[in-house]
Amino acid sequence: MKEVQPIRDTKKIDAMKSIMKGESNYRDLLLFVLGINTGLRISDILALKWGSFINGGGRLLKTGDQLNVVEIKTKKVKSFVINRSVAEALKLYHDSLVSPNPDDPVFSSRKTDDGSLQPITRIGAWQMLNRYANMVGLDEGIGTHTLRKTFGYHLYKKGVALEYIQKMLNHSSPAITLRYIGITQEQLNDIYVELN
């Protein structure tokens, strides 16, 4: 089994988003965009309720608003500001629904016998990601960690200090972060070569 990798090519990321928009799969678009723009674990994304995205005044969060998520694994509160990409995907998805209940899961898959909505499973999220990845020619190394790894990888490529990325991902060392986001020795060697 191949190790899960980040999506390194921004053209592939854009192509996946375009397909999701073209198919009006706004739920999938929000899940994808939220994952690659926040670094949240898939378990935290799938646990989100609509109430998390509504501010005290009853308004849907928009660019610049803060979202607080209690991480399931660490029990720590992760706070971050909603960026434009997340805000746009959130609005598209929210507007495509009929008044979602604040207690409903954002990423629902089906109703149970009692009529309540169930969140999609990790396997469902994995299948969805792989479907879109295959459509753009990414056939291997895609998993639910791909979203979080993609977040870290692109921060690193944009020059964000490794220590910040390490903190954002709650890693214990820079070496763990480099390995997690898929920075290879070959890429590090390229940096040395480019110093001329």
Whereabouts are the PLM-identified features?
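Active-site-proximal segment of tyrosine recombinases
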Residues: D44-L46, G141-I142, G152, V160-N170, ...
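Short alpha-helical segment immediately N-terminal to, or the first helix within
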Residues: L34-G35, H154-L155, M168
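Short, basic (Lys/Arg/His-rich) helix/loop patches that form interaction surfaces
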Residues: S18-G22, W126-E163
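Basic, Lys/Arg- and aromatic-enriched nucleic-acid-binding interface segment
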Residues: T10-I42
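Flexible interdomain linker/hinge and immediately adjacent N-terminus
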Residues: M1-K12, R110-S116
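Conserved tyrosine-mediated DNA breakage-rejoining catalytic core shared by Y-recombinases
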Residues: A47-V86
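Catalytic-site neighborhood detector that most strongly recognizes the C-terminal catalytic loop/helix
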Residues: V69-E71, K75, L169-E194
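Basic, alpha-helical nucleic-acid-contacting "clamp/cap" segments
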Residues: I72-T112
